[in-house]
Amino acid sequence: MAGNAYSDEVLGATNWLKEKSNQEVFSFVFKNENVQLNGKDIGWNSYKKELQEDELKSLQRGAETTWDQSEDMEWETTVDEMTKKQVFIFDSLVKKCLFEVLNTKNIFPGDVNWFVQHEWGKDQGWHCHVLIGGKDFSQAQGKWWRRQLNVYWSRWLVTACNVQLTPAERIKLREIAEDNEWVTLLTYKHKQTKKDYTKCVLFGNMIAYYFLTKKKISTSPPRDGGYFLSSDSGWKTNFLKEGERHLVSKLYTDDMRPETVETTVTTAQETKRGRIQTKKEVSIKTTLKELVHKRVTSPEDWMMMQPDSYIEMMAQPGGENLLKNTLEICTLTLARTKTAFDLILEKAETSKLTNFSLPDTRTCRIFAFHGWNYVKVCHAICCVLNRQGGKRNTVLFHGPASTGKSIIAQAIAQAVGNVGCYNAANVNFPFNDCTNKNLIWVEEAGNFGQQVNQFKAICSGQTIRIDQKGKGSKQIEPTPVIMTTNENITVVRIGCEERPEHTQPIRDRMLNIHLTHTLPGDFGLVDKNEWPMICAWLVKNGYQSTMASYCAKWGKVPDWSENWAEPKVPTPINLLGSARSPFTTPKSTPLSQNYALTPLASDLEDLALEPWSTPNTPVAGTAETQNTGEAGSKACQDGQLSPTWSEIEEDLRACFGAEPLKKDFSEPLNLD
């Protein structure tokens, strides 16, 4: 910037603003409103009474001098004298209010930076902007300053009012000015407390960017917005003409512009968040994320898996409610984002699928005892657990005692984790524990009675609202139901009357699994890892848990009278060390089947099959051997399970073809 390019006044004002650019100051607005008292109109220009105090007269003369010196002689102003006089009086009254408050605080005026500008707005009319600040000012004093200035401003306005008012009317005018806050302070509303706090502005920036850019009013009455006159504590902008003011603003803007402008991109989520999170909120969110990740669904699980966070929340004020609400958010997140099938599948150890044998699982053995296609039954159950069964949203295990109903249901519920239990003893609120769950378990269901309609809605996967004890009603989203019973739940009795109209609707909502085969006493429980492995096996072998996949595999949607035995399960072969399908032919040896021929030893080695005979096995073909064939078969079954002769023959034909086998089988048996 060349030194002789601009006047000393312009450069002085620019440098002065740059020195004060980072000083924080209060921003006040002085105004008045049109008032009517007992038919007497008091407007913005009703305060032209001659001032009597010498200090006020001196301030008024200073305002007149500022107007004259800052007036641009290139065009003639048309602002009338009455408007000018009113502005001069307002200027003296505003400065008088400022000086009186400074005296109250024992602050020397020379230690304060201030700026005053009188303006006219299209909507607001006359108003005066005041910036004031210094080393003895703090943000907490802003509201106190506003109250004091409001009191002095109302008092001096009443003194300067040239309308003939009675003493009572003067008091009323002052009350109106104080109650309506004719002096306002720039504030902001805190997002958390919702309270107003003082908003400080930067002294130099506010003047250069806002006040100096406005146009001067040159007509009376004013047609457009603009400023009348301005003054400051440094006497730097008092006598600047409109063009010089704009030049100061431009020079200040150019000098204060940063060399590099850094841009930041704010995402919509950050804008929405918008507030500062407390440490407590951050801690709760972190804990909640860990609980969801570890699938914690009960206080007991929390105590065992995350004891530190549990103790931390328990020690806080209102810790019990905090624990309860946090756990409720966790279960709600799981219920809305995962299905019961998803929670089961994620527990599967996929590395063990290579050696996993589906027929060996206790669940499939129970189904196989009935001659069922256990793959088909498990596939149907998984579709319901994945909320893909449509209206048939309930898996019903029913039949006599000790047939395996509860152990299968218990294994599924344990694998899901987030399970709600129906409480038949709580007559008024039986579903109190069933909200925000991935699975509803109804153990030993009985007569539905008065609750039949509510049961039908939940069993069909509808969204309904239920009553809770001590709370308002709550919504249950579509949730799979698993149910066990020894009774015929399709027969509904209300009092002593049977209601047959409910029978078919109940059947339409159930996946009917009727177990009748009594299990031996040493059968044992279903392993906790069994159902995750079953689900993983089904997915790996193309049995997706969707009704479309089920229909593609088995032909149609299952109904109440579904025949689980059709189609038959293909008989697995070459499963060393695994049990055979219970509904295939009994285990046998060549002795029990009276075969005259046996494969060559080299063939057995090629097939990696262990021979069924031992050195103590009687020789085939003798009378002793024929009489003890049954005992030999039983001994073989009691020992390590071996392939049947029919299976070996089938494998040999697959490996060597029919012609070589025909030749081998035609040779006489040589047992030497």
Curated annotation (Swiss-Prot):
Pfam families: NS1_C, Parvo_NS1, PV_NSP1
Region of interest called Ori-binding, as start-end residue ranges on this chain: 191-195
Binding sites annotated in the UniProt record for a divalent metal cation: 119, 127, 129
Class of the enzyme per the UniProt entry, highest EC level: hydrolase
Boundaries of every SF3 helicase domain copy: 373-528
Chain residues that bind ATP: 399-406
Function, as annotated: Multifunctional protein which displays endonuclease and helicase activities required for initiating and directing viral DNA replication. Also plays a role in viral packaging and transactivation of several promoters. Binds site-specifically to 2-3 approximate tandem copies of the tetranucleotide 5'TGGT3' within the origins of replication (Ori), unwinds this hairpin region and nicks one DNA strand thereby initiating the rolling circle replication (RCR). Cooperatively binds Ori with host PIF and probably other host factors, which activate the nickase function of NS1.
Family affiliation: Belongs to the parvoviruses initiator protein NS1 family.
Record protein name field: Initiator protein NS1
Lineage: Viruses, Monodnaviria, Shotokuvirae, Cossaviricota, Quintoviricetes
